[in-house]
Structure formats: C-alpha cells, structure tokens
Amino acid sequence: KNMITGATQMDGAILVVSAADGPMPQTREHILLAGQVGVPNIVVFMNKQDQVDDEELLELVELEIRELLSSYDFPGDDIPVTAGSALKAVEQLLSDPNTARGSDEWVDKIHALMDDGDKYIPTPSVKVDKPFLMAVEDVFSITGRGTVATGRIERGLVKVGETVQLVGIADTRETTVTGVEMFQKTLDSGMAGDNVGVLLRGVQKEDIERGMVLAKSGSITPHTEFESEVYVLNK
C-alpha cells in the first residue's frame, strides 16, 4: 500500500538492487507496480558492489536486471545502471563531510547515479495553469493554529487567504487556507508537484480524512458511480 501511494506521485525512480544477491522477489513486484501506476522513468543502482569481487558476476546481475525491466515493458537496454556501495560512500562522508568529487571512488559512484537521474529523468512540466487540486494523505492538528492537511498538489496553485473546497466522503464544504508549509518552511503559496501542509480555518481534525481532496471552489464535484480499471497483484 505504501509503495503504491508513493509511486503514483513519482516523476521517476531509482531501483536499488543488491549486486551481491541480484534481483529479489520484491524487486519484481516493485517494477511491476511502477509500471502499473505509470512511473515514467527508472534508473538503477546496484548496491553493495564492495561485496562482489568477480566482475563477471556484476555483469550477470546487471544483465538480469535489464532483462527483468524489459519483461515489464521498460526499456531495459537503455536504462542507466550504476554500481556502487552506499555504505562505503556514507562512511567516507562521515569521516570527511567535505569530500570533493573525484577524490573518492565510492562517493563518485553516488555522484554518477545522480548524474544518471538528471539526464534520464526529465524535469516534469507542472500543471500550474489548471484549477488547484490536492489529495489529502494525512491530517494533524497544531496546537493554537488549527488543522493541517498534507499531500502533493496535483495541479494548480494555492495561496494563503484563498477559499478552497473540501470534497469527498462527507458533504462538500468551503474553508480558507491560513498557511502553507513545505519541509518546515512557511510559504505564501504552493504549486503543482509540491508536497505541502495546508493549514485550514474552521476545520476540525475529525472533519477531514485521507481520501478527501482540497480543490478550487466549484472546480470538481464528487461522484458515487464511476468506471475504473483495477489491477490485482496475485503473485
């Protein structure tokens, strides 16, 4: 459930596979689910390279990963694959936080992975010209301030002081945005693609729950009948 929730919001993903063990059953599931929910781009990191002495074994694991990706309609032959060791990189950075690029083999491999992500996963185009919409993922209260709904803004903009509608499950109601926060920073607004907390006026915690949405007033209506496509993972 949690993997699917996160994957539906992704513009790209890093698939981490142990170079020592190769693809595991959950690797196959993650690739399958990534394809089902529409993750557009994947890059691969073969971790624990420090545990593999045989270069041919490393090549075999890479080949297995590429074949697995291709079997689920990802371009396995074209996807960037980087081998390295996250542990070795972390150990080096803990010993010297100022390690420069080019001065340590393991840290450089993480830089190479980030380069792959920058090149292969394009910067998404954000839908700021459409009406505001955010699915509520979690709700909590801040003493003295009110109720905060958190989630990823799917489209549009939301600004402090705007009136929005709370739609779904319960009756549709209007509320005013009194604050927008992202990563513990207070903002004047949030835009499509941002993961934010939206502070709402006059809404109690019990009035809002996961599954509801915040939207620009009058832009959407709830429905009790709809057509859907369901994929059941059975193996």
From Swiss-Prot:
Organism: Leptolyngbya boryana (Plectonema boryanum)
UniProt-annotated binding residues for GTP: 47-50
GO molecular function, one term: GTPase activity
Protein name per UniProt: Elongation factor Tu
Domain of life: Bacteria
A matching Pfam family: GTP_EFTU
InterPro entries found in the cross-reference section: EF-Tu_GTPase, EFTu-like_2, EFTU_2, P-loop_NTPase, T_Tr_GTP-bd_dom, Transl_B-barrel_sf
Keywords per UniProt: Cytoplasm, Elongation factor, GTP-binding, Hydrolase, Nucleotide-binding, Protein biosynthesis
EC number of this enzyme: 3.6.5.3
Catalytic activity: GTP + H2O = GDP + phosphate + H(+)
Physiological role: GTP hydrolase that promotes the GTP-dependent binding of aminoacyl-tRNA to the A-site of ribosomes during protein biosynthesis.
Entry's Gene Ontology cellular component terms: cytosol
UniProt enzyme class: hydrolase
Lineage, top ranks: Bacteria, Bacillati, Cyanobacteriota, Cyanophyceae, Leptolyngbyales
Subcellular location, record wording: Cytoplasm
tr-type G domain mapped to chain residues: 1-125
Quaternary structure annotation from Swiss-Prot or TrEMBL: Monomer.
Family: Belongs to the TRAFAC class translation factor GTPase superfamily. Classic translation factor GTPase family. EF-Tu/EF-1A subfamily.
